[in-house]
Amino acid sequence: MTKITIPTALSAKVHGEGQHLFEPMAARCTCTTIISSSSTF
């Protein structure tokens, strides 16, 4: 939090990579939940 002098482009790049890593993980979790819930029927 002390590094407020970070360029916006760099922080946007890091945020973009964070989203890139998080999106597949969230999608996989959602797919697993749907599969497990549908297999209980």
UniProtKB/Swiss-Prot annotation:
Cellular localisation: Secreted, Cell wall
Cross-link (5-methyloxazole-4-carboxylic acid (Thr-Thr)): 32-33
UniProt modified residues of type N2,N2-dimethylarginine: 28
Residues making up the propeptide: 1-27
GO cellular component, one term: extracellular region
Domain of life per record: Bacteria
Keywords, alphabetical: Antibiotic, Antimicrobial, Bacteriocin, Cell wall, Methylation, Secreted, Thioether bond
Cross-link (Oxazole-4-carboxylic acid (Ser-Ser)), chain numbering: 36-37, 37-38, 38-39
5-methyloxazoline-4-carboxylic acid (Ser-Thr) crosslink site(s): 39-40
InterPro entries assigned to the protein according to its UniProt record, in alphabetical order: Plantazolicin
Cross-link annotation Thiazole-4-carboxylic acid (Arg-Cys), location: 28-29
Residues joined by cross-link Oxazole-4-carboxylic acid (Ile-Ser): 35-36
Broad class of the protein's primary localization: secreted
Cross-link (Thiazole-4-carboxylic acid (Thr-Cys)): 30-31
Post-translational modification: Maturation of thiazole and oxazole containing antibiotics involves the enzymatic condensation of a Cys, Ser or Thr with the alpha-carbonyl of the preceding amino acid to form a thioether or ether bond, then dehydration to form a double bond with the alpha-amino nitrogen. Thiazoline or oxazoline ring are dehydrogenated to form thiazole or oxazole rings.
GO-annotated biological processes: defense response to bacterium; killing of cells of another organism
Purpose of the protein: Peptide antibiotic inhibiting growth of Gram-positive bacteria. The mode of action appears to be disruption of cell walls and lysis of cells.
Protein name according to UniProt: Plantazolicin
Organism: Bacillus pumilus (strain ATCC 7061 / DSM 27 / CCUG 26015 / JCM 2508 / NBRC 12092 / NCIMB 9369 / NCTC 10337 / NRRL NRS-272 / CCM 2144)
